Every structure is written in structure tokens, then in C-alpha cells.
Amino acid sequence: LLFLSDMIKKESGGIINISSLASYQALPYFTVYSSSKAYVTSFTLGLYEEYRESGVKILCVCPGYTKTNFNIRAKMSSKPLAGYLMSSEEVVDQSLKAYSKGKYLIINGKINKFAKFFTSLIPTSWSLKLSRSIIKKGMDEKNW
């Protein structure tokens, strides 16, 4: 927000905040991560609505699992989701396209959009159990 007032005066500029698909539900074993990403999403969408007529573009990027070192640092295998991982370059490309179109939110990748939609249809308790199962399987994986 340091430069937001200057952008508003110029009626141009932009903010891109990186959140996560994890911002849309609590993730067992990654509670702090999903909670902090929920804050980023809520904060960014709130800013967007406050300043939508200011000429400043504000975008919240919510990628799902992406091919990065995150899994290594989290001591978790990416094998259970290997076929669904996007490259960071794909995430950036999609995000910049969304930004250039003036969108305020992007959930990167079709599988991630489906996952968000699907989890909104099922009871929270099921969604939590499903997340726990997927994450636990990745944490238990020995060959990564």
C-alpha cells in the first residue's frame, strides 16, 4: 500500500497479490499457510472493490499446486498430483493475461477451478477429509 496513493493520484498502476487455491478452505497440516492465503485473498478483493473506479488495477492470483520447491520445503511429495501441476511460467502467463484484461481474480488452471467448484458443493467435513487424505498421502510418500 506504500505506493497506492500515488497510483490513485495518477489514475494508473497496478497491484498483483499472490494468494493460493488454499485460501478457499482450511488445509490440515498446512493450517497457517491456508489461513494466511485466505487473508491475502480477502485483503486483495477488498482493495479491489474499494479502488475499482480509481484507474488502479488490482489482481488476486490463486494458483493451485505448481511445480516449485514448495513441496520439498514442506517435506511433501508432489507425486499424487503430478499430472495436474502447472509450471510457474504457465501461472505467470495466465496471471499477466488476466491483469491485462482488468480482471480482479484468477484461479489458475482448469483443474484448480474445478477443485474450487467441487469443494463448494460438498459438506465442509468431506472437503477437510479429502484434503487431509491427499496431503497425508503426499507426506507419507517415501520416493520423492
Description of each model-found segment:
Residues 27-31:
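Active-site loop immediately N-terminal to the catalytic Tyr-X3-Lys motif
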Residues 1, 45:
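A short, exposed helix-loop element centered on a Lys and neighboring polar residues
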Residues 17:
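Rossmann-fold scaffold of SDR-type NAD(P)-dependent oxidoreductases
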